Amino acid sequence: SDFGDFLRSAGNTAPEDEPDLNKIHFNMDIFRAFAKGYIESAKSFLTPLEIEMLPYAVMLFPYMQAVRFLADYINGDTYYQIKYAEHNYVRTLAQYKLYQEARRAVPEMKEYISLLL
């Protein structure tokens, strides 16, 4: 989970509440650098299945965060601190866009991980 959550933040080319969705992309260079170091350190205790699932963790975390922001927005913004009325809604859209970008990158992430093993 640390792997996916780190890349939700570091792999995003924009802030998590970026209103301009065209600025949101998944940075594969950050993924490659982080995955290389992570797998080199963790492959001794991760199972092959856990390593295989790492790209899905990258995709899952922005999706989960989008759901959390949306739930908070619907429930009256009681959990996450907001700066303006639609802040959690904007965050929802931004995180969902990052999810879509990460989802498109899954084949490339899987290919890169296979080269590290």
Where are these predicted regions, by residue range?
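Active-site activation/catalytic loop segments of kinase-like enzymes and analogous catalytic loops
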Residues: 1-44, 60-79
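ATP/Mg2+ or Mg2+-diphosphate-binding catalytic cores
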Residues: 64-117
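All-alpha amphipathic helical-bundle segments outside canonical DNA-binding/catalytic cores
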Residues: 46-58
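General structural signal for secondary-structure boundaries
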Residues: 27, 47-48, 110, 117
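Sparse, context-dependent recognition of short Cys/His-centered cofactor- or disulfide-binding micro-motifs
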Residues: 39, 55, 84-87
